[in-house]
Amino acid sequence: MKSEPTSLDFTSSNLRRMNRDHSSNNTNRTVLNLPKEILIIIFSFLDPRSLLSAQCTCKYWKKLLSDDLSWRTAFFHHFAGDQSQIFSPLGNGTWRQEYLLRSTITRAYEKGKGQTVQYDCRVGQLTNLYYDFSSGRLYSGNWLTGTISVSDPTTGKVERSLLHASTDGSFTHGLSTMTLGKQIFGFGFMDGRVGVILMSRQAETPRKFRYCLDSHADSVTCIDALTGDLPPTGEIGMVTGSDDGSVHCWDVKTGVSLQSFQFRSSQILSLCFRPKYKMLLVDTFNYELNSYQLYLIPGYARSRKNEQPILLSSRKCVLTDEEEPPCLMTADCCAGVAFLSRGAPKNCICRVSFKEFLEKNDNVGVQTSSIPLNGKPTSISLDTNDRVLSKSTPGRGARLLAVGDENGLVYVVNTRTEDPNKAILRTITAYSNFPITDIYLNEVAMVVGSASGYCGVYDTVTGNFLKKIASARNAARREPINCILLDSNPLSLKGVITMSKHVKSWSYTIPKPFVNKRSKVLPLRPSVTHDNLSKSSDYSKNEVEREIMLGLDQIAQERREKMEARQKFEQHFGEGLVGLSEEEIIAYVTMLSQEEEAKRMVQLSMDVDKIEEDFKENDEQATSSLNALSSNHEPPQEQANVAELNEQEQIELAMRLSLMEM
C-alpha cells in the first residue's frame, strides 16, 4: 500500500498531481459556476454600460443577459420599484429597451448639459402657448390683448410682425377665450362671435384674422381645435361652446357651422374634441337641476345631422358659483375613460368609464367612481402615450394622469385601473402651500409648475426629482408658471415654460447609440388620415411651404416699406430725384440745406436793415413832433404883437396857424 507523501516528499509526479487537483477545485469556485439566479441579482447592481460590456465577456453571460428577466431585475433595482410596479411604457415592449432608454434619459436630465434660452415674446402677459417641435416654431398668445407672436425658442428670435385677433390689427376687442394649434388659432368673443387665423398656405388668407359666418347668442366660454395639420374642406376643425348652452362645429377653411347642438338651461364649461376616435365630450352646468352633466357625441368625424348628445353622468353642485372651482376635464379615449375635477367638500377626481357603453350602446355600461384628493384640484394633464398596449408589456400597459392641487401636491394616477383605492400610484410634493398651476408629462418625465414661480422635472416611475427649470428666490419676483409644453417624443428632451411675459426653453441631449434603438409601435385602432396631407419627415412639405410663406411675407413687407418711403420722398422733393443713389441724395439734401441757410442769413440781414431804417424814421418823426410842440408855445408872443400888424399880416398869420393845427 502506497503511503501519502509527506511535506518532504516533493517528487515531480507528486507536484503535478497536487497542482492538477488544486486547479480543479478553483474551477468549481469561479463566478462562471454560480447559479443563474445569483448572477442575475449580481448583474442588477450594474449600470447599463456595464451590463452591455458584461454581455461581451463570454457565451454564458451573453446567453444569460439575452434573457429579458435579467434586464427586468436590473430595471426594478435601478428604479427602486417592486415587480408589480405600474408605469407608462417607453420602449418597444422589452425590458432591455425600457431599462436602457429610461436610465439614459433620466441621467441626461440629472447630469446632462444642454441649451437654455429665455426671452421676451413681446405680447405682454402670456396666457396661451403652442410649440411645433417639428418645425421649431413657438406660438405665444395673450388673450387679454388678442396678440400672438411667432418665435424660435432655440435662438430667442421673435418675428417682427404680430398676429392680431381683429381685422384692423387693433388691441380693442371683447375676446373671452383663445386656443393655439399647429395651423389653427381659434378665438371666442364676449358677443358670441368666433374667429380664426389659419397658418397654412392651403387657406385663402393665411396668417390673416377673419370671423366665422355664424355666431353664438352669448359669450364663448371654451374652444377646442385640432392641434395637427389643417383638415380638408367639409370636415370639422374646431368646436366652440357658449354661455347660452350651444355648441358649434366649424369648418375652419370656409367659416361655416357644419353642426350645432343646444343644451337647454345650461352653460358649456369644457370640450374634449377627439376626431381620431370620433368622439366629442361636452361638460355642462344645468341651472335648473343645479348639477354638472357630461355628454358624449359618438361617431363624430364629419358633419352628420342624426347624432344626438348622450348623457353619461350627472354630478350635483354643492357650492355657489363663486366657491366652485373651474371644472377640469381630460379623456383617455383609447380606453374609453373621462376624468373630471370636483372641488370642496368632495376634493376628488371623477372617473367616468364609457368603454362598455361604446361596445354595447347601453347606458348601464357607464361606470362612475371618485378618486379622493387632499386638496382642491387646480391642474390636470394626461401623458402623451396614446397607444394601445397589452398588459404583457412593461408597466402593464398603463397610461398616467397627473393631478395638481392647491397645497402643492401632485398625484400620479393610473387611468386604466377601475379600483379607486389603487388608482393613485404615488404622491409628489412639488412646492408646499402654493397651488400647482400647470402640469405636462410624457412616458419618462413630468414637468410641474407652481404659483410660486417654481418649475421642476420629475421621474414618472419613481417620482424622484430630476431637474430644476426655474425658481424665484425673491418673493416680489414670483410669477406663476402658466403654460408648460414637452415634446411628445420622450427621446427628444425639449420643452418650454412661460413666466409672466417671458418664455424659457431647454434642450438636453442623450447619447446617439440609444436614440435610434426604439422601434415604432403602431396603434391597433386605425387613425383618421387625410389623403392631401403629407407624411411626417425630418423636413416635411408643410415646413417647406411655411418657410416659403414667411419669406414671401417678409419680401412683401419690405417692398411696402420701400414704396411708402418713396412716396414720402416724392412729396418732399418731387419726382425728379427718383433713381438717385443714397450718396447723391445726401449730397443734394446737404446742398439744399446750405442754400436755405444762405437765404436765411440774407433775409436776416435785410430784416436788420429794415429795422434800422424804421428806427431812423421813427426818430425823425419824434424830432418833428417835438418841434411842433415847441411851436405851439410861441404863438402867445406873436399874439402880443398882433396889434402892431396891419390887416393883411394878421390874415396871413391866421392862415399859417390854421395850417399848423391841421
From Swiss-Prot:
SUPFAM superfamilies associated with the record: F-box domain, WD40 repeat-like
Highest taxon of the lineage: Eukaryota
Domain (UIM) ranges: 581-600, 646-662
Chief site of localization: cytoplasm
Localization: Cytoplasm
Span of domain F-box: 28-74
Region of interest called Disordered, as start-end residue ranges on this chain: 1-27, 617-645
The entry's keywords: Cytoplasm, Repeat, Ubl conjugation pathway, WD repeat
Gene Ontology terms, MF aspect: ubiquitin-like ligase-substrate adaptor activity
CC terms in the record's Gene Ontology section: cytoplasm; cytosol; nucleus; ubiquitin ligase complex
InterPro entries: F-box-like_dom_sf, F-box_dom, UIM_dom, WD40/YVTN_repeat-like_dom_sf, WD40_repeat_dom_sf, WD40_rpt
Ranges of the WD repeats in the UniProt entry: 215-260, 263-302, 429-468
GO biological process, alphabetically ordered: SCF-dependent proteasomal ubiquitin-dependent protein catabolic process
Gene3D superfamilies named among the record's database cross-references: 1.20.1280.50, YVTN repeat-like/Quinoprotein amine dehydrogenase
Compositionally skewed regions (Polar residues) per UniProt: 1-16, 621-640
Its biological purpose: Probably recognizes and binds to some phosphorylated proteins and promotes their ubiquitination and degradation.
Subunit text: Part of a SCF (SKP1-cullin-F-box) protein ligase complex. Interacts with skp1.
This protein's name: F-box/WD repeat-containing protein pof10
Organism listed in the record: Schizosaccharomyces pombe (strain 972 / ATCC 24843) (Fission yeast)
